[in-house]
Amino acid sequence: MLRGSDAKRGYMRWWHSFQGICPTTQETRTFFVEYSILNPALGTSQPILGQHPYYKRHGLKPSYLCIKAGVFPEPGDSGLQLRAYYPLTSLQVAQDPFYMQFEDCVYSENRISGSIDISDEVARHRSLMTDAGSFIWDLEVHKAVACHTGYIANAFFTAVHALESFWHGEGIRTFFRGTVILNGVTYEVAPETSYGYADKHWGRSYNQPWLQFASGHLISEKTGRELKHSALAIDGCCPKFLFFPMRRRILMQLTYTGEDFEYHFGRPLTLSRCKWKVKETNKRFIWHFKAQNRTSVVRISGSCSKKQMMPLLYESPDGKVSDIPLWEGGNATGTIELYRRIGGSLELIDRLQFENGLCAYQRS
């Protein structure tokens, strides 16, 4: 949890995304559930909303617990973003293992559950940044593959604010099991088809640019089969030195049948280097990545249609909401080429197709 000055100017959020299937229509949708805390040391018996005219007028920073839940859009079917706010006084927390609850919303390492019901009247208040609708979830969670970011997420670098936003990919391949009820329609979530993802971010502000890319649905060109214990995760970050921002970096891990290929500055002995490019067209976002270290090289290309993405809203600890949209979706597709260095040459390990990828981008 947030401590010290971060508790007065900081955030922590736990993200989950996964697929569910409606048993009556066989429709597949990609859902998301996020638990977040903003400036907990400033909390009172009521949530302080940074976009509310009263709190803006009095110069109060936001402080609340928030549940954000919804579904990403599909062609011909719009997405939904629901937000509900709770006071810090409603928070119950236990450690070892970590457990968090406020009202009927529960988070633990192996289960999440809760509900949101937003009326049309409530949704008309722009300060709440929410659509109207209802969402109920009750899910078992099994985090099968984690991303290891090395020393950069330890207590010292967190205390000196070496990054604007820290990341722990605690479940870059996660299996969900349970049910979701969206506006009265039930969806079943099964481990083998959930293609789930779970992570945690915390810090003093959100990354600019905001860049994220991940998939736990990898298919081998060698065998034509879906890979087990395999996943890709990429997260952008903004390092600082003596409080001055440095060149933007990415943290990348490709787990291939249980073997981790890591490309980030949290593992300095691997001599990692990463390049990336993001292109926005009228219809799509397109990503290209190339990363290498002492023992391997990976090339990644992926894209997602804007019809399957939506702008998500976030309020920063200082009470600001960016005018630049954060586009996010859950159906990115693309290719991966993975090579191993053998002497002075490269040996192809495998070519992979990926589907059902989580993708997010907000330019600076």
Sequence positions of predicted segments:
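Structured soluble/peripheral alpha/beta segments that form catalytic or ligand/cofactor-binding pockets
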Residues: M1-S364
